[in-house]
């Protein structure tokens, strides 16, 4: 992934445009500055069941993270692809040589060591670590969490409907995780950075599996009565140039792009905005990434203007400006 892609992802996931060209600000990676959308939702809405509230699959989205919220709001990254026959979530199972009795002894030993080390006192850092341990233990011992991640147990016809592709099985896994209580699932799919041979890449590798997976997810959520309570957003970090380059590809373009919303209180079957005949620039009121994040957080019941203080005491709003895209709301 090139620097511009990473910078674009940071902007899309946090709403804050990086003001440093090389992805670094005085040696600090930019995913350590502002919290990403998933981390905001994780902090504001919290856990709901044993599964982590914020999950990324099949790999980290990149350029987004917990920022000044701290590591407890970082995503749980699966980093294996559910389309693989051997798909298994790392660290989800207790070691084979540790039976239930031994596991309980280890847990009591850890609790005793924590109490001794704290000297009967519990500061903020100690309490945070204790929360880590408790959530980790809940994850590895929860039958519900194991069931949610066990995509191999899904009905074969359902798996085929989503498509036996990375985006298909990631979308199906996302539905299972939302059912189990997860708040935010981030899915990354392939490389749409088609600087070379754009049309073949879209026609054969990118569009068909995405179309199948997305339509299956919407239908599945609707049939299960989940769509009105689940917001689905499909987007990239930028658009592509209207003009084809010398390699039959399209380059980076930040002036115009499309985003798809479904469910979660949005209005179905609605096209908002328009562009010129070459899709170069909007011909109606343009919307910013801040408008987009403002709308998403509002639909999730979160105040996008809420102020947090960084560790240095600097007041920072969740979203730096923006307003609701009212035409989108049902």
Model-derived regions, located:
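Ligand-binding pockets and gating/stacking loops
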Residues: 4-330
């Amino acid at each position: 992934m090139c620097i511009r892609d990473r910078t674009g992802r940071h902007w899309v996931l946090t709403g804050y445009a990086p003001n440093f060209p090389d992805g670094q600000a005085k040696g600090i990676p930019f995913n350590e500055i502002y919290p990403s959308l998933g981390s905001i939702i994780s902090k504001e809405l919290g856990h709901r069941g044993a599964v982590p509230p914020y999950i990324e699959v099949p790999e980290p989205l990149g350029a987004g993270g917990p920022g000044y919220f701290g590591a407890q709001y970082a995503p749980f990254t699966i980093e294996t692809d559910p389309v693989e026959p051997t798909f298994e979530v790392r660290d989800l199972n207790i070691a084979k040589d540790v039976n239930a009795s031994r596991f309980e002894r280890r847990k009591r030993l850890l609790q005793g060591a924590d109490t001794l080390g704290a000297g009967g006192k519990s500061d903020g850092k100690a309490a945070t670590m204790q929360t880590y341990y408790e959530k980790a233990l809940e994850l590895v011992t929860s039958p519900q969490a194991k069931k949610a991640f066990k995509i191999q147990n899904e009905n074969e016809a359902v798996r085929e409907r989503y498509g036996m592709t990375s985006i298909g099985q990631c979308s199906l896994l996302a539905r299972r995780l939302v059912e189990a209580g997860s708040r935010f699932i981030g899915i990354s799919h392939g490389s749409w950075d088609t600087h070379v041979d754009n049309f073949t890449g879209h026609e054969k590798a990118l569009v068909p599996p995405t179309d199948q997976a997305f339509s299956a997810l919407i239908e599945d959520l609707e049939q299960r009565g989940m769509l009105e309570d689940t917001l689905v957003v499909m987007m990239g970090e930028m658009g592509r140039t209207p003009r084809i380059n010398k390699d039959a590809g399209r380059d980076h373009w930040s002036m115009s792009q499309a985003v798809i919303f479904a469910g979660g209180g949005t209005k179905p079957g609605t096209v908002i905005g328009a562009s010129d005949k070459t899709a170069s620039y909007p011909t109606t009121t343009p919307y910013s990434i801040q408008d987009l994040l403002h709308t998403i957080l509002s639909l999730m019941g979160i105040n996008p203007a809420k102020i947090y203080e960084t560790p240095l005491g600097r007041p920072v709003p969740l979203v730096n400006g923006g307003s609701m895209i009212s035409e989108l709301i049902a």
